[in-house]
Amino acid sequence: VPYITDDELIRLDLLAQTAVLTSQGVPFILSGEEMLRDKKSVHNSFRSPDSINRLDWNNLKRYTQVFDYYAGLIALRKAHPAFRMGKAEEVRKHLEFVDAPKGVVAFRLKDNAGGDAWRNIYVVLNSQKTPQSVKVAEGSYTKVVANGKVNAEGLGLISGSTLTVAPQSALIVHD
């Protein structure tokens, strides 16, 4: 991608994948996404040779952080039914969008959605190049996704009624 650094590309990729893996429904991940597969800017590679379509396994070493993030998000999704409710009425009952600034999507999965052990889960996706904040219910929250890291056991605690998410990244917290 022209005019973008590798660091920004990685941040945006992780942000996009967080949107995919925290959305309801069946997630779809293309082959090689977890290692930043590159098709050399060929937009329709159907008839391109293997040199364009192959998986470059060296990228797995080069982008370990990306692979680990994907694996962590997949594990988080599998462990928490709130991210994969099976019926539309469940989604309507347990998912609510949170007011957010331009370039930010925020939602809450509430009331132990899908039978989840976590009572409330806030997902905040920030596409802006500056930190952004959203107002939430006053409380003490455990961070499980922040700054390109995933840890279901927790990355720290946040108390209060404001969640601030780093530029071009995602924040997931629960109580």
Regions found by a protein language model. Give the residues of each.
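Solvent-exposed beta-hairpin/edge-strand motifs
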Residues: 137-150
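Short, polar loop/linker segments at the starts of domains and inter-domain junctions
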Residues: 1-6, 151-162
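C-terminal beta-strand-rich structural cap/linker in extracellular carbohydrate-active enzymes
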Residues: 155-175
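Short, surface-exposed, polar/charged, turn-prone segments marking secondary-structure boundaries
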Residues: 56-59, 83, 149-153, 170-172
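Short, flexible beta-strand-to-coil junctions
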Residues: 111-113, 129, 145-148, 175
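Loop/helix patches that line or flank the sugar-binding groove of alpha-linked glycan CAZymes
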Residues: 1-139
